[in-house]
Amino acid sequence: MKTLLLSPVVVTIVCLDLGYTMTCCNQQSSQPKTTTNCAGNSCYKKTWSDHRGTIIERGCGCPQVKSGIKLECCHTNECNN
């Protein structure tokens, strides 16, 4: 009888994604799109210019940046493309 009572609980746990992850883009500048799974709930896109031109860095989280660097943080899958 205990086995029958535990079966729905096990099925529920297996079907739910208890460790939610986000998918963030992580390609640099104009490279082909690549993604990574992130444990947090945000993605970022940093943009700045130097002697090479406009540089774009993408990844997980929402880091602190120096002045002169544009930072966009977002909270949906692949929102930083």
Swiss-Prot record:
GO terms for molecular function: acetylcholine receptor inhibitor activity; ion channel regulator activity; toxin activity. Residues 1-21 form the signal peptide. InterPro entries: Snake_3FTx, Snake_toxin-like_sf, Snake_toxin_con_site, Toxin_cobra-type. Expressed by the venom gland. Disulfide bonds join 24-43, 38-60, 62-73, 74-79. Keywords: Acetylcholine receptor inhibiting toxin, Disulfide bond, Ion channel impairing toxin, Neurotoxin, Postsynaptic neurotoxin, Secreted, Signal, Toxin. It comes from the Eukaryota. It is found in: Secreted. Pfam families: Toxin_cobra-type. Belongs to the three-finger toxin family. Short-chain subfamily. Type I alpha-neurotoxin sub-subfamily. Binds to muscle nicotinic acetylcholine receptor (nAChR) and inhibit acetylcholine from binding to the receptor, thereby impairing neuromuscular transmission. Its main location: secreted. Changing residue 64 to E: In minor variant. This is Short neurotoxin 1. SUPFAM superfamilies: Snake toxin-like.
